[in-house]
Amino acid sequence: MLAKLEMILEGEEIDYRNSSNLQGVLMERIDTEYAEILHEQRLNPYSQYLIKNENQYIWCIQTLNEEAYEQMIQKMISQDFSEFQIKNKKSAIRITEKKLNIQKKANLMEQFYEEPGKKYYNIEFMTPTSFKRNGQYQIFPDLSLIYRSLMKKYSASTEELDMYCLLYTSPSPRD
């Protein structure tokens, strides 16, 4: 199950520099045991980011599997979570609206495989983005890093196929 929760935030101390602090808010809401599991994983089955759309700040949380959905989005969409405070900040941040979009993986795969692909795609990064290669952060990603990241995210969303492992552990065609 693929899910995206969008929360419209209202408060004086919201800006893009707080997006890493929102990670802390998220970790405080989930079960301690699940938070520990996430810290041990090399690839998280979720992403979160803060964007500004016109005059609204929108905090987005996306999950790639059922467990992440239950542990994260279910807790964040709860009626009792209507405001929070970022550590070391004075004022509360209110959540004025929540929107949940759920898509079954089968529907996504059907769309991906049955609709004709384009020859060219434009990629627009909505937040600052970096990729890790050989333990170093790359702030200017190349196509191989983008593909690698997409394959890892896909593999994290399914138990049926590990795309990344297949690609990087298979013998080369010349062998």
Predicted regions and their residues:
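Conserved small/polar residues in nucleotide/adenosyl-binding loops
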Residues: Y168-D175
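Mid-sequence acidic-hydrophobic segments that form the walls
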Residues: Q79, E124-S130, K153, S157
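Ser/Thr- (and often Asn-) enriched beta-sheet segments in non-cytosolic proteins
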Residues: K4-I8, I58, Q85, R94, ...
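Short acidic alpha-helical/loop segments enriched in Asp/Glu that coordinate divalent cations
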Residues: Q138, T158-L167
